[in-house]
Amino acid sequence: MARLTRRTFAIEPDVSEKMDALVDGHTLEANLLINKALRHYLEWGRFVENFKLVVSDPRLMKLLWSHLTVEEAREMGLQNGNSAVVEFILYYFRKFDLESVLKTFRVIGAEYSNAFAYSESGDDRNRTIILRHSMGQSASAYYGASLKALSVRLGMEVELEETDDQLVCKIRRVDKEQAIAPKTPKAK
């Protein structure tokens, strides 16, 4: 079991009552709940407002993607991958490298947004990323264009396989990976 750090803090009475009802008096469950809520805020919630991120029902997203052509979705993904996602990654991780790009897709796209199921395999030179989503070809085109734009910016070769229900992205290092530092100095 992981070593825990003890902290003492006060919570509002209505939050305490809801938490007690949810965990039914089990201390361990209360600790897990609090850790999960804090982790969710630290890894996701505090960035939602700054970048105007939202979590949407996958059925709604499937409907949205069905109203875009594959080329329109690909263009949106390319624009997003060349601007907003780079800014988000630099803000969130304070660096822009392959690991931060993949972690963004894994944590933000899969774990918190539930936009797709993420799987990854490979080594330092070659990676295969699979995003399973069941939202149509346009969703694959969007995610593929975004991931490709980010990877190419890092000096990597990318091969995409897009289907109606998933994107397979094969990334290969060409030479030395390029990394981009944030524009603003890190706060001390």
Can you name each region flagged by the protein language model?
Residues 109-165:
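Short, hydrophobic/π-rich interface segment
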Residues 28-51:
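Short, basic amphipathic alpha-helical segments that act as recognition/interaction helices
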Residues 58-129:
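An N-terminal amphipathic alpha-helical segment
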